[in-house]
């Protein structure tokens, strides 16, 4: 089980990703978490807010996966998240869930390209070496 601690509503909570997370999300929302994550990424790229209800479902699913596997109650409820979570905390949670899911499915992370591999864009087709 992959886990990560984040702060939500002033409490440090552990989010986990495993098959139980996907099942819990499906039970809460009657949708596939992969679809939510795709929508959340699209919202973030357009700098709009993803559906808060589905963000809360995803957070609760990740908390339940961790705390119930340990026989413990989750430290936050959906009501706590709706009423007390700051937008930045919800954003952090979305990125955390995306990262955990990528790690769970072994999705390779892109490597930044070295500056030397960037094609020359000068009009003459020659490199500008900074000479006058």
Task: Identify the function of each model-found stretch.
Residues 1-12, 32-47, 57, 69-132:
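Charged interaction scaffolds used for protein-protein
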Residues 62, 66-70:
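Amphipathic alpha-helical interaction segments
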Residues 29, 47, 51-52:
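Short, solvent-exposed helix-helix connector turns and helix-capping sites enriched
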Residues 19-38:
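Short, surface-exposed, low-complexity cationic segments
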Residues 53-61:
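Elongated alpha-helical scaffolds
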Residues 15-17:
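Short capping micro-motif at the N-terminus of alpha-helices
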